[in-house]
């Protein structure tokens, strides 16, 4: 089968030149200049119709040659008229409210398009015989062609970059014949697949069903032709744009926070409908970062690499955190903006943040996975009932790692199941507090997920061994700080060094 023969037949069936290229299996940029591509494929130009060039030339004069009617296979989906209508509708929507450089088109196509592709598949097999495979479509599928043809054009005209994680433009299309054709398809389905139809009380007609079940190897052309014309009939009306809905991207903003207060919960602390604390780390950060990206602060998800108790500070480099912001109105964060947010959070006096930045969603694996394999570094102020002896200090200089068995602490049983968890303690060092001979400052490196307070006092033998059992004396914890978290993420950025 020669390309010229194929194209001449397609022309006789009312197929537009862009769809002719689909049946010639054109790719990418080959759709941008139809004349050039047809000549390259040894196809003579049709001088009787205006080529449907995809590049919309500003200020160009319309051709006096006759235009094609509505394409019998794409129903005008790839026409200039539809491109112009689509662009105008996008610009007339809330598109300008989104400050996003990346976009993605999600186009819901009517099933009428799939039925026309199938009708042309049957027609080509009748005309060209075995050279048209009965299992593999003879064209570039409509959905793929949309990505190859429409996406680049829309992105170029909107001055945006295509990205699957960008602003999603949901486009719903329909055609006046779809309702009638779906009814016919239900009847066809019963005849083409009687065994399946007999076992189904209700037949679900879907695009997926058409893709999987309807091809010449599974449905006879004679059966199909009882309900639909082969090749597909010409139509007067083109495809219609029914709605455009915009959904902003999911933006992830990461950084590190330091918790400076011993009277601040990690997330809102509400019990029986009553707030137990006025504020939380989550609320302070979201309050100052969220409005840059969205008005719906309640939709933002706050995550961190672990958490502290209310009375525990987090110092050092801080704890990695991330905000997941759905349907964001903005996708970028300049250093100026990030620095202003950092200063606003710092002004709370309870939380400090730094290294604030937008990160790819894929990087959230750093927060979500392998949590228990991470190391955590703590400093605890502990009290004895007697002055610290040299022996006690020696017993608490532990450089070799050891394992403990730790039951779920009583204080968290209301939100954690009762389990005994093995945990690794990597090192312990201790020194006497300068101002109190009965007090110890103990530095501990542990596996993430270790309950440090219970590691110190043992909680009536529920943690074994404990530091108290190691020295053989009662010991309690007075204050605790997290001083380090073994997670090198997100990367360090100094937002204070921005251009004025």
Curated annotation (Swiss-Prot):
Recorded coiled-coil stretches: 30-50
Pfam families: Pus10_C, Pus10_N_euk
Gene Ontology biological process: tRNA pseudouridine synthesis
Primary role: Responsible for synthesis of pseudouridine from uracil-55 in the psi GC loop of transfer RNAs.
Entry's family note: Belongs to the pseudouridine synthase Pus10 family.
Entry's Gene Ontology cellular component terms: cytoplasm
Catalytic reactions of this protein: uridine(55) in tRNA = pseudouridine(55) in tRNA
Start and end residues of each stretch annotated as RNA binding thumb loop: 406-421
Keywords of this entry: Coiled coil, Isomerase, tRNA processing
UniProt xrefs under InterPro entries: PsdUridine_synth_cat_dom_sf, Pus10-like, Pus10-like_C, Pus10_N_euk
Entry binding sites for substrate: 378, 451
Name of this protein: Putative tRNA pseudouridine synthase Pus10
Enzyme nomenclature, EC number: 5.4.99.25
Catalytic machinery residues: 309
A single GO molecular function term of this UniProt record: tRNA pseudouridine(55) synthase activity
Organism (species): Drosophila melanogaster
């Amino acid at each position: 089968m020669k390309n010229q023969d194929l194209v001449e037949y397609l022309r006789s069936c009312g197929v537009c030149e862009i769809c002719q290229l689909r049946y010639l299996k054109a790719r990418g940029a080959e759709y941008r200049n139809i004349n050039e591509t047809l000549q390259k494929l040894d196809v003579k130009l049709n001088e009787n119709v205006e080529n449907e060039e995809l590049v919309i030339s500003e200020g160009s004069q319309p051709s006096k040659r006759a235009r094609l009617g509505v394409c019998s296979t794409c129903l005008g989906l790839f026409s200039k008229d539809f491109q112009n209508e689509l662009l105008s509708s996008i610009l007339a929507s809330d598109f300008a409210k989104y400050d996003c450089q990346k976009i993605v088109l999600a186009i819901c196509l009517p099933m009428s398009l799939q039925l026309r592709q199938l009708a042309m598949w049957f027609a080509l097999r009748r005309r060209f015989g075995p050279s048209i495979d009965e299992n593999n479509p003879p064209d570039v599928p409509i959905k793929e062609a949309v990505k190859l043809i429409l996406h680049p054009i829309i992105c170029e005209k909107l001055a945006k970059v295509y990205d699957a994680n960008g602003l999603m433009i949901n486009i719903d299309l329909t055609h006046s014949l779809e309702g009638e054709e779906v009814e016919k398809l239900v009847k066809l389905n019963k005849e083409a697949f009687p065994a399946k139809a007999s076992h189904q009380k209700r037949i679900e007609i879907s695009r997926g069903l058409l893709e999987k079940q309807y091809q010449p190897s599974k449905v006879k052309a004679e059966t199909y032709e009882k309900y639909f014309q082969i090749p597909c009939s010409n139509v007067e009306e083109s495809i219609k744009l029914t709605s455009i809905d915009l959904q902003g991207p999911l933006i992830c903003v990461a950084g590190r926070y330091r918790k400076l207060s011993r009277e601040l919960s990690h997330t809102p602390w509400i019990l029986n409908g009553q707030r137990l604390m006025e504020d939380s780390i989550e609320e302070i950060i979201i309050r100052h970062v969220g409005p840059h990206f969205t008005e719906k602060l309640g939709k933002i998800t706050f995550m961190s690499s672990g958490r502290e108790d209310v009375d525990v500070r987090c110092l050092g480099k801080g704890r990695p955190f991330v905000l997941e912001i759905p349907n964001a109105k903005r996708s970028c964060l300049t250093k100026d903006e990030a620095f202003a947010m950092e200063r606003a959070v710092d002004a709370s006096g309870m939380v400090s943040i730094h290294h604030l930045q937008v990160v790819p969603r894929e990087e959230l694996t750093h927060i979500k996975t392998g949590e228990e394999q991470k190391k955590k570094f703590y400093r605890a102020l502990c009290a004895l009932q007697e002055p610290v002896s040299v022996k006690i200090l020696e017993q608490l200089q532990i450089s070799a790692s050891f394992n403990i068995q730790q039951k779920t602490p009583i204080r968290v049983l209301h939100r954690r199941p009762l389990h005994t968890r093995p945990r690794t303690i990597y090192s312990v060092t201790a020194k006497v507090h300068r101002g109190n001979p009965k007090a110890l400052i103990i530095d501990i490196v542990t596996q993430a997920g270790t309950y440090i307070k219970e590691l110190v006092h043992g909680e009536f033998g529920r943690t074994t061994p404990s530091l108290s059992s190691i020295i053989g004396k009662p010991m309690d914890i007075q204050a605790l700080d997290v001083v380090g978290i073994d997670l090198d993420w997100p990367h360090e950025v100094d937002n204070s060094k921005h251009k004025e």
